[in-house]
Curated annotation (Swiss-Prot):
Signal peptide: 1-17
Matches recorded under InterPro entries: UPF0321 (IPR019445)
Protein name: UPF0321 protein P20C8.02c
Similarity comment: Belongs to the UPF0321 family.
Highest taxon, organism lineage: Eukaryota
Pfam families: DUF2430 (PF10353)
Residues carrying a glycan: N20
Keyword Nuclease: no
Organism of origin: Schizosaccharomyces pombe (strain 972 / ATCC 24843)
Entry keyword annotation includes NAD: no
Keywords tagged on the record: Glycoprotein, Signal
């Protein structure tokens, strides 16, 4: 019984490690972005809010914090949310953005 409990604990730890966002390199993020990410995760690296809400909040934060939106903005957002500094980051899934009249936060990606 104890062995089964230990195996379950190890399994849970491995599963939790998969959703841990602490792999983001804070040193490469501007201080405000790192602070935003730190506020959205708990001490175990688990997201405190619904993923779509976090992504929308992070995107709005970046748009309000940067005077000129460009590919660097998208790359910073991608790094903030995924740890990857790239502009090829489908943050809202793999659906194609159909324009502002058809916004669905669960499927929209950052252009």
């Amino acid at each position: 019984m104890l062995l089964l409990f230990c195996i379950c604990c190890v399994f849970i730890k491995l599963v939790l490690a998969e959703v841990n966002l602490t792999f983001v390199d804070y040193a490469k993020l501007p201080p405000n972005y790192a602070e935003l990410l730190a506020n959205l995760i708990d001490q175990h690296g688990l997201m405190l809010f619904d993923t779509a809400d976090v992504r929308i909040e992070a995107y709005n934060y970046l748009l309000n914090s940067i005077t000129e939106t460009n590919t660097d903005t998208d790359a910073y957002l991608c790094q903030l949310l995924t740890g990857q500094y790239t502009t090829d980051c489908y943050i809202f899934g793999d659906s194609v953005y159909e324009g502002p009249e058809n916004i669905n936060p669960s499927t929209r990606y950052i252009d």
